[in-house]
């Protein structure tokens, strides 16, 4: 009985922590800073620099969690993630532009536009098989789109999850 009460208490505490993080993310998004292209590019640069600084740690964590060699860890996860971030950095302005789209004749003389706007707060849940790449690439995409993001790394890759947490905390300190 005592363990069930303790487990329930821990779940409630985790839930309140999740709610606190979500509210902070929503409040930050409401400030409107993420709409600016310069802000997005700066965040992507910080993310890239932090990944480069923790590159060896990521590869070691992937070896510990999944038995991947350092070469495989770099080629299949770190290198691809860095390439994605660099591509997003180069193209974030183009991705954010309003585009003209065709409209049907039934709506003549209307004009159609596709306006790229951030959603707000997004969630990234990483699987166990590519825990670094499939957490960081969607995070980078969310940042490039102007969203705030909550990242939930895989529980089945604890060493990699710890490195991801360190990178995210280094790049995006709370507050």
Where on the chain are the PLM-derived regions?
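N-terminal Rossmann-like NAD(P)+-binding subdomain of aldehyde/semialdehyde dehydrogenases
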Residues: 1-113
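Rossmann-like NAD(P) dinucleotide-binding subdomain of oxidoreductase/dehydrogenase enzymes
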Residues: 105-175
């Amino acid at each position: 009985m005592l363990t069930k009460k303790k487990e329930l208490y821990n779940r409630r505490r985790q839930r309140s922590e999740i709610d606190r993080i979500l509210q902070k993310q929503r409040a930050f998004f409401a400030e409107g800073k993420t709409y600016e292209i310069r802000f997005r590019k700066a965040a992507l640069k910080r993310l890239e620099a932090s990944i480069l600084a923790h590159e060896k740690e990521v590869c070691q964590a992937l070896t510990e969690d999944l038995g991947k060699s350092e070469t495989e860890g770099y080629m299949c996860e770190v290198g691809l993630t860095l390439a994605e971030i660099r591509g997003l950095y180069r193209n974030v302005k183009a991705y954010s532009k309003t585009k003209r789209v065709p409209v049907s004749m039934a709506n003549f003389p209307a004009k159609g536009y596709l306006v790229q706007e951030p959603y707000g707060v997004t969630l990234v849940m990483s699987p166990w098989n590519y825990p670094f790449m499939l957490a960081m690439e969607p995070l980078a995409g969310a940042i490039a789109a102007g969203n705030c993001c909550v990242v939930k790394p895989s529980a089945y890759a604890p060493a990699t999850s710890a490195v991801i947490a360190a990178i995210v905390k280094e790049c995006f300190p709370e507050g």
